Amino acid sequence: MLRWQTAGESHGEALVAMIEGMPSGVRVTSQDIRDALARRRLGYGRGARMKFEQDQVRLLTGVRFGSTLGSPIAIEIGNTEWPKWTEVMSADPLDHELAREGRNAPLSRPRPGHADLTGMRKYGFDDARPVLERSSARETASRVALGEVAALFLEQVAGIRTVSHVISIGGAGVESDNTPLPGPDDVAALDASPVRTLDKDAEERMVARIDEAKAKADTLGGVIEVIAYGVPAGIGTYVESDRRLDAALAAAVMGIQAIKGVEIGDGFLEAGRPGSMAHDEMVPGDDGCIARLSNRAGGIEGGMSNGQPIRVRAAMKPIPSIPRALRTVDITTGEAAQAINQRSDSTAVPAAAVVAEAMVRLTLAQHLLEKFGGDSIEETRRNIEGYLASWPEHMR
C-alpha cells in the first residue's frame, strides 16, 4: 500500500515529505526533485518569495545510488529564509515577553477565506501564526516532491505520463472546448509559458487580466486541468465507493489549498446534455481493438480507468491574502479591523496546475500498486504485462 505524509511550516527550518510502499528499483535523483520544485515556482503573477525561494532538497532515506530501495523515502526541503525566522518559529520556549514583541507579536486579525479564525478556535490559539504557517500553500512543495517520485515510477513501470495546463485565470483564457489537449511532449512548452498554456491568444488574455488585478491590489483564481496518458483500463473499482478511482482523484485534488471544485472529464457540462450526446460510443478500431468516438467521461467509467486519457479539472478560488486587505474583526478587542496581509501572489493558478499534477500522479501510483502490487518495479511491471495479456483478443 502506498502512503504519504508531509510535515513542516511555511517559515520553519524545513519541510519533510515521506512516502512508504514505493517498490524498489525506481530510478530517482535529488536533481529530479529539484527540477519538479522549480516547475512549481513558475508562473506570471507570483509574489516576491518565488524570486529568492530556492528549494534545498535532500533525499534522506529510501534511495541508494539513484534507485529506490523499497523502504520509506524521506525528502527534506530546506527553507532558505530560515535565519530570519529562527526566533518567530523557534521550537524551544522563548521568554514570554520576547515571544509577544515585534515580529513575534500575535496575529489577531484573521483573514477571510483562510483557515485563520476557525483554526484558532479549533486548536485553542490566540494567534493566527500557528494556523497560517501549516495551512500555507508552501506545504504543497512537499507534495510536488513526492509526486515526482510517483511520476518516475508510473513512467518506468507502465509508460504512464501526465501533463497539466491552465484553462483560464480570472475568467479569461481558452475560449473553445475544441482546443486540442496538450500531450506529454508539450511539457517544456507549457513550462515556458507564463500562464501554462499552449494557446498564445489565451496567454495574452490571461496575462492582461493578471496585470489588471495587480494594478487594483487584487487576486485571481482560475481553472486548471491535468491529463494522464497511458493508464491501463481497470484501475479502481465499482465494487466499493471508497475505492473508485474518480472519487480518489477528486479527493486528492480537492485537498489542495484554495481548490473549490473538481470535475472528471466533461463533468458539469454533462449535466446539460441528453444521454444520447453524453456518453462515449464504442466502435471496432482499425487495429482490431475497441475504439471510442469521444472521451467525455474523462477516461473513467464506473469508478475505473477505461484506457482513455484521464482528465481532471479543478477550480481555484482567488488567493485570500489580498494586498488591500479585507474587513475582519480583531479577536483581542472585538472591534472591526483590516485583515493581516502576509506576502502572497496575485495568482498562483499555474503553480496549482503543477501541484494538481502531483496529486494525480500520487493517486494513480497508489491505485496502480493496489491493483498490481510488487515489491520491486520489475515485479509490478510483470504483473501489469500479465494482466493486459490476459484480456480476450476481442476485448482489447
Swiss-Prot record:
Disulfide bonds: none
InterPro entries: Chorismate_synth, Chorismate_synth_AroC_sf, Chorismate_synthase_CS
Keywords of this entry: Amino-acid biosynthesis, Aromatic amino acid biosynthesis, FAD, Flavoprotein, FMN, Lyase, NADP
Obligatory cofactor(s): FMNH2
Pathway assigned to this chain's UniProt record: Metabolic intermediate biosynthesis; chorismate biosynthesis; chorismate from D-erythrose 4-phosphate and phosphoenolpyruvate: step 7/7
GO molecular function terms attached to this record: chorismate synthase activity; FMN binding
Catalysed reaction equations from the record: 5-O-(1-carboxyvinyl)-3-phosphoshikimate = chorismate + phosphate
Residues annotated to bind FMN: 134-136, 257-258, 302, 317-321, 343
Residue numbers binding NADP(+): 40, 46
Taxonomy, superkingdom: Bacteria
PROSITE patterns the UniProt entry points to: CHORISMATE_SYNTHASE_1, CHORISMATE_SYNTHASE_3
Gene Ontology biological process terms from the UniProt entry: amino acid biosynthetic process; aromatic amino acid family biosynthetic process; chorismate biosynthetic process
Cofactor note: Reduced FMN (FMNH(2)).
Assembly and binders: Homotetramer.
Family in the record: Belongs to the chorismate synthase family.
Summary of the function given for this chain in its UniProt record: This reaction introduces a second double bond into the aromatic ring system.
Name of this protein: Chorismate synthase
Organism: Bifidobacterium animalis subsp. lactis (strain AD011)
